From Swiss-Prot:
Presence of the UniProt keyword Cell membrane in the record: yes
Membrane topology, as annotated: Multi-pass membrane protein
This protein's UniProt keywords: Cell membrane, Membrane, Transmembrane, Transmembrane helix
Organism the protein comes from: Shouchella clausii (strain KSM-K16) (Alkalihalobacillus clausii)
Family in the record: Belongs to the UPF0756 family.
Organism superkingdom: Bacteria
Pfam family, any one: DUF441
Recorded GO CC terms: plasma membrane
Keyword Nucleus listed: no
Protein name in the entry: UPF0756 membrane protein ABC2716
Transmembrane segments: 8-28, 54-74, 84-104, 117-137
Main localization (coarse): membrane
Cellular location(s): Cell membrane
Length: 157
């Protein structure tokens, strides 16, 4: 008999296949392979503990490749400071990093919020051509929203 977690992953795989989402297909395939080979008890806790940080590191490496290849250098950095859009991008980068930082603890400490965020990410990735960095940013936005609600509730309560 298939476990609930396996059935859930297979359902997500069906959604990923229908949506033709390669990232989700690969992610689910890796998880099922680990689960079916019996390595889950050892590998899943490590992935859960370190996965977000590893993913952020991989994304950071990808973003820094143009610097490593020389496609972006000090000249381009200097030119960017003359552009309003570059300043908007700089501010956006700072804001997103701060929002995401708030989300990391929320993802680690609040399982029911994590489930909702993961579901939202799966929907966005599968059907709206979203990218799976959503849980981290989503958690940060959720954290800020929850803090705002708490603040407003204190003012009125």
């Amino acid at each position: 008999m298939l476990s609930q977690s396996t059935l859930f992953l297979l359902l997500l795989m069906a959604i990923a296949l229908i949506a033709k989402n390669q990232s989700l297909i690969i992610a689910i395939s890796v998880l099922l392979l680990i689960k079916w080979t019996g390595l889950g008890d050892k590998v899943f806790p490590l992935m859960q503990a370190k996965g977000i940080n590893l993913g952020v590191t991989i994304i950071t490496i990808a973003v820094l490749v143009p610097i490593a290849t020389g496609d972006i250098g000090f000249k381009q950095l200097g030119e960017a400071t003359k552009s309003l859009y570059a300043w908007v991008a700089l501010g956006s980068g700072i804001a997103v990093a701060l929002v995401a930082a708030s989300g990391i603890d929320l993802l680690k400490n609040d399982p029911h919020i994590t489930a909702a965020l993961v579901l939202g990410t799966i929907v966005a990735v599968s059907f709206l051509n979203g990218v799976a960095v959503g849980p981290l940013i989503g958690a940060g936005i959720a954290y800020l929203t929850m803090r705002a609600i708490q603040y407003i509730a204190q003012l009125w309560g």
